[in-house]
A protein has these predicted regions:
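A domain-start/cap signature at the N-terminus of enzymes
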Residues: 1-64, 146-148, 153, 162, ...
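Serine-hydrolase catalytic machinery in alpha/beta-hydrolase-like enzymes
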Residues: 44-47, 54, 60-141
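Alpha/beta-hydrolase
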Residues: 66-68, 172, 215, 268
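Short beta-to-alpha linker loops that shape the active-site pocket of alpha/beta-hydrolase fold enzymes
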Residues: 97-101, 175, 271
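Conserved hydrolase catalytic core segment
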Residues: 157-167
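The feature captures the conserved acid-bearing segment of alpha/beta-hydrolase catalytic domains
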Residues: 168, 173-259
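C-terminal catalytic histidine-bearing segment of alpha/beta-hydrolase fold enzymes
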Residues: 247-300
Length: 300
């Protein structure tokens, strides 16, 4: 990744986010079910969809689950995989859409690495969360974050940048991982995180976030995840975490546990690179995090 893609708080991003904060989305009549893709006021190049369960009361604070799509941008399936979960828990689901190639340079992977050009994807997600609160008139506290494949790139790097915003995180089959490592530069390690993003890893806050890792035991393809010299995200040690997704996720588990984080690691028998199988395990994990649920009060 070019260093020019990682400069902290570019003028365009700061201006867009500042204007969004000054001009919140108007609160309209709250409806239940799925919304269309809603333009993000912080930066209309990006959008998000919500699932709102029925019978949310007044202006209460409710759980929020953010589900981040993979490389093919299946935002609807990312959202809908947690719809029944949301009904059970009285939770809202937010599924962002980070389109490929927003700068016209052929980069389809920018959101996975949190920044490209003037875009800070972590800040965009936080702007979407704030807009959703204003739009539907509900408050969210710390939220649950789930990501599969490309979305898992985003999820575990968001944990590094904003652990104080997370209630729990589920990381499913990422192609590459960033390890807590002060000796190696971003994105392989965290040495220059503070210079690039204005934040160093907050290990104390990270230890308060339960972490779920999930992958199929047949997720063994390597061609699409091997970094080669000259490729866009090549850097020294780019493949150091392992040859395939299973090995890389195991490296992430060991790294997080070595720094005191509580990690549940599911290896799913008979599954390859399978979103549905990983989402099922993620739902189980988040059920444990949120507790018994409130289905009688929130059933359709």
């Amino acid at each position: 990744m070019a260093k020019a893609d990682l400069e902290t708080g570019s003028p365009t991003t700061r201006q867009a986010l500042g204007e969004a904060a000054a001009r919140p989305a108007p609160t309209g009549p709250r409806r239940s079910g799925t919304t269309p893709l809603l333009s993000c006021r912080a930066d209309p190049r990006f959008s998000y969809s919500l699932f709102i369960p029925p019978r949310l009361r007044g202006t209460e604070r409710v759980p929020l689950l953010v589900s981040v799509h993979g490389s093919l941008r299946g935002v609807e399936s990312s959202r809908d995989a947690f719809a029944d979960f949301a009904r059970w828990h009285g939770a809202v689901v937010l599924a962002p859409l980070f389109p490929a190639d927003p700068l016209g340079d052929g980069n389809e992977d920018g959101y996975k690495y949190m920044a490209e050009g003037d875009i800070r994807y972590d800040r965009l997600l936080l702007a979407m969360v704030a807009e959703a609160e204003a739009r539907i008139g509900l408050g969210f506290d710390r939220f649950c974050l789930a990501g599969f494949s490309g979305g898992a790139h985003f999820a575990h790097r968001f944990l590094l940048l904003h652990p104080e915003r997370l209630r729990a995180v589920s990381i499913g089959a990422p192609g590459s991982v960033t390890l807590i490592d002060p000796k190696r530069g971003w994105w392989v390690g965290t040495r220059d995180m503070e210079r690039l993003f204005g934040r160093a890893p907050d290990l104390e806050a990270m230890r308060r976030v339960p972490v779920h890792l999930a992958i199929g035991d047949s997720d063994l393809e390597t061609a699409s995840i091997t970094h080669r010299p000259g490729s866009r995200h090549w850097m020294a040690d780019a493949n150091r975490a392992g040859a395939n997704r299973i090995a890389r996720l195991t490296s992430l588990r060991r790294n997080l546990q070595a720094h005191g984080l509580a990690v549940r690691h599911d290896i799913i028998p008979g599954a390859a690179h399978d979103f549905a199988a990983v989402a099922e395990r993620a739902r189980d994990f988040f059920h444990d995090v949120l507790g018994p649920g409130r289905a009688p009060a929130f059933s359709a």
